[in-house]
Amino acid sequence: MMGKLPLGVVSPYVKMSSGGCTDPLKFYATSYCTAYGREDFKPRVGSHRGTGYKSNYRPVVFYQPHLDALDNTATGEQGCNNFQTVTSQSYRPLEVPDGTHPLPWNLHQTNSGYSREKASAVTPIKEVRKVHFDTQDYGPQAITGLEPKDAPLLHQQQNKGSLEWENAGHGPRFMTSEYNSKYLKEPSHQPDLLQKNSVGAKEETGFTEESNKNPIVFQPPSQALPGDPVLLPGRSVTKSDFLPISHPHGDEFLPVLARGSERETGFSRVNERTLNPRVPPPCPEPSSMNHWQFQSPQRMQQTNVALLGRETVGNKEPSGFSLNNPSYVRSPYDPDMDNRYLTTYNQGYFENIPKGLDREGWTRGGLQPQKPGGYALNQPVTRLEATPTPTESLRRLHPHLGRTLISVDPFYRTAPPSGHVSRFTAPN
C-alpha cells in the first residue's frame, strides 16, 4: 500500500491553473502546459520569407515610358533615360547602315566598324599639351600664371634632390625622367687634348692579376714542363685546355700513321693500355700477310727495371672501399637466408618499417581487426531506459500533478509484492 502524498505549499501558478491535465498518457505535463495549454493545439504554418539577404532588398519598380504616353508626356520624356541600365546602354542592338550616315573623312578607314566610339588607351599629345607645359620650349616665365610656386615650410620637402625644386618648383621637365633630366651628363664639345683624358693599354682585372698561387697545384718553374698552365697561376685550366678553334692555313703536315698504331679507327691515335700486357691478345682467325705487317709487336719491350729483375707483381687485394666496410651481417628476419641487397646505408640506418607478420594488417587483402572510430567513440551507446515505476514517477512530479494522475487513473499505483494474494490494489 502506498502512503499519502505530501500536499505541500500551494504555489501561485497552481492557483492560476485551470485544472489538472486530463490526459493520462501525458506524463511530461509542465506548469506552462497546465496553465496556458490548449487541447489539440497545432502550430500555425508560417510562410517562407526567403533569406535575410533577399528580404533586405528594397522593391524595384521598373519604369516604362509608355505609362506616361497619354496623360503625362513631358514626364515620360524626362525619365526615359533615367531608368536605363548600364547593360542596355553599353550593349545595344545591332544597327545596319542604311546609307544616311555621313562618309568618313579618310578614304581608308583604319578603325573597326564594330564600335563607333574610338577607344584609345593612350592620351593624344594634343590633349597632354593643354594640361602640361613644356618648360624646355617656353620656360616658366614665358606663360602668364606659371610663376614659381611658393609652398608653406611644413609642406616643403627638405631632403636632397627633391623633384619639386626643378623648373622653378613645377617638377621635372616635360616627358623626361628624373635620372635623364638630373643625373645624365651631357657630352662635352671640347677636344680630348683639353679634357686631359688618356687611354692606356688593356690589362687584366684585379681578380686575375692579384690572385694568389695555389699551394696544391703550383710547382716551381724548375719542376714544371715548358708550356704547363701551372706556370701561369692567373690563367684558368679551362682556358689552357679548351683552346680556340684554329682554321688550317695550308702549311700543316699531312697526317701520318705512327708505328705500331691500329688502322681500325682514326678517332684516337693513342692506344689504350691493356690490363695484362705480357699475355698476347688471342687471335681467333689467321690474319693475312698484308694485315700482319701493320700489327703491333707481339712481344712487349721490357723496361730497364724489368731487365734488372726489380719489377715484381704482388697478389691481388681488395680495394679500400671493401676493406673499410663492416663485416657482413645476416638478415635478422631470416638468419638462414642471406640478404643479397644489404647495403652500408641499410646497416647504418635501420629501417623502421614493419615487415613479415607485423605488416599483415596493412597488406592488400589482409584481415584487419575492427577498431572503434571517432564517430563510435564520441557517440554514447544508445540504451533503452528501464520502465519507470509509478512510485518513482509520483515522487518526481509535482504534488498537484500526482493527485491528478491518481484521481484519473485509480490503478496508477505500485504493484504489491509477490507475497500478497491480490495483484491490484483497490483505490482509497
Swiss-Prot record:
Pfam families: PPP1R32 (PF15691). The keyword Cytoplasm applies. Residues 201-231 are annotated as: Disordered. Its main location: other. One of its GO terms (biological process) is flagellated sperm motility. GO terms for cellular component: axonemal A tubule inner sheath; cilium; cytoplasm; sperm flagellum. One of its GO terms (molecular function) is phosphatase binding. It is found in: Cell projection, Cilium; Cytoplasm; Cytoplasm, Cytoskeleton, Flagellum axoneme. The keyword Cytoplasm applies. Keywords: Cell projection, Cilium, Cytoplasm, Cytoskeleton, Flagellum. Microtubule inner protein component of sperm flagellar doublet microtubules. Interacts with PPP1CA. This is Stabilizer of axonemal microtubules 4. It comes from Bos taurus (Bovine).
